[in-house]
UniProtKB/Swiss-Prot annotation:
One of its GO terms (cellular component) is extracellular region. This is Potassium channel toxin kappa-KTx 2.7. GO terms for molecular function: potassium channel regulator activity; toxin activity. It is found in: Secreted. It comes from Heterometrus petersii (Asian forest scorpion). Has the structural arrangement of two alpha-helices stabilized by disulfide bonds (CSalpha/alpha 2(S-S)).
């Protein structure tokens, strides 16, 4: 009986460890996606600005680069 209790506790700790690893990996991936979206939007701003003005320095200022 004591062995089954020990196995049960071990399985609970293992499940908790796996859950925390997965949740931390997901949060890191979300941070990477957020930074990519900001970079993507910034590049789109510069592209549109360059199409209208043709002045890279002005576009850098306008797009906060």
């Amino acid at each position: 009986m004591k062995t089954s209790g020990t196995v049960y506790v071990f399985l609970l700790l293992l499940a908790f460890g796996i859950f925390t690893d997965i949740s931390s990996a997901c949060s890191e991936q979300m941070d990477d996606e957020d930074s990519y979206e900001v970079e993507k939007r910034g590049n789109a701003c510069i592209e549109v600005c360059l199409q209208h003005t043709g002045n890279p320095a002005e576009c850098d200022k306008a797009c906060d680069k």
